[in-house]
Design a protein with these regions (language model features):
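Amphipathic, hydrophobic secondary-structure cores in small proteins
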Residues: 16-18, 23-59
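Basic, low-complexity segments
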Residues: 1-15
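C-terminal structural segments of small proteins and small subunits
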Residues: 48-76
């Protein structure tokens, strides 16, 4: 599903990273949230591509999806 994101226990303590790098997804998302632009990130990290940044955002969005469990289902 996330071809550009990797999770490896031996890299960055198992944090999700841009594949082939040690750049954690949370770092990219945080930088964007703090006002950095995609163009600025591409200049700061010339070895990544726009698609890598988009993959970080997609990954973060997936993690942020709410999982709603009905109380009736839990109570039985």
């Amino acid at each position: 599903m996330f071809e550009r994101i990797s999770i490896d226990a031996s890299i960055c303590h198992g944090q999700a990273c841009i594949k082939g790098t040690r750049i954690p997804v949370h770092q990219i998302v945080s930088m964007l949230a703090n006002g950095d632009t995609i163009e600025g990130l591409l200049r700061a990290y010339p070895h990544i591509e726009r698609e890598d940044i988009n993959a970080c955002l997609e990954y973060a969005a997936t993690l942020a999806e709410e999982q709603v469990t009905s109380i009736e289902k839990v109570a039985g």
